Amino acid sequence: EYISFLADTKSLAFKDYDALHQWSVDNQAAFWESITQFFKVDFDTPYEEVYVPATPFWKTKWFTGAQLSYAHHVFRNATPAQPAIIYQNETSEVVEISWQQLIAKTHALQQQLKTLGVVKGDVVLCYGINSPETVAAFLATNALGAVWSSCSPDFGTDAVCERFAQLSPKVLFAHQQYAYGGKVYDISTKIKTISDSIGAIQNTLLLDDHLSFDDAPVAINQIHIEPVSFSDPIWVLFSSGTTGKPKAIVHGTGHMVLEHLKALALHQDVRKGERYFWYST
């Protein structure tokens, strides 16, 4: 479909996938602009220039002037025809979370964040498991234009603080318990240690209080969507810390919108209605 799109709109022809890949490498600006067009990326503010090269390379700018929202591109696919999330942990049955339930939970968590004064550019953390309520917490954070970062609950407090303390976070989401290998672990003491050790954290919200999902009649447009600049951070990851303190790895919002659309469709051939699983911490 993408190759046909390039033929129809750009008069480009490729004999095979390798030729397409080589074109994308040799013509980066044209390639990434075509991704925005093929996937109909919604820019709240249009871009001025696609690509502004610079030396050193990390000062290169993409889609200058553009504003957009990652959360918007998630919720624009909402449909009652299929679930948003299918979830199971070691101690639960399989549950399906509808798009309406995800919208309602995201809205509820976003209202809490707004009450706590979280605004665009603030950092919100999560020390918890991969779960539907964690997804909703991320979407609530992202929709406000705030920055997300997270650590797995099996991390020790020192490892977490080494990472999170670099970010001057305002709010910490956390799960008090998690199950692994047939055992349930209580980390409430670790949560308090982290919160007390990082002075910037003003409030801790326990995701254990948000395990239930309902079909509250919340419309998508009731979730506040705050567009951010293309290169504004969406989340902060960290290196392993094996050669010194963990180093922050910042991903841009627009970069992740484009990369996820491109990677899931062109590399992994994920199509509408299919189910996708990514094994990760």
Residue ranges: model-predicted function:
Residues 1-97, 101-104, 108-114, 195-200, ...:
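N-lobe entry segment of adenylate-forming
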Residues 81-83, 206, 218-238, 245, ...:
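Conserved pre-ATP/AMP-binding loop-to-beta segment of ANL
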Residues 122, 126, 268-281:
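Conserved AMP-binding loop of ANL adenylate-forming enzymes
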Residues 127, 151, 175, 207, ...:
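Generic beta-strand/beta-sheet core signal
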Residues 143-215:
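Structural core segment of the AMP-binding/adenylate-forming
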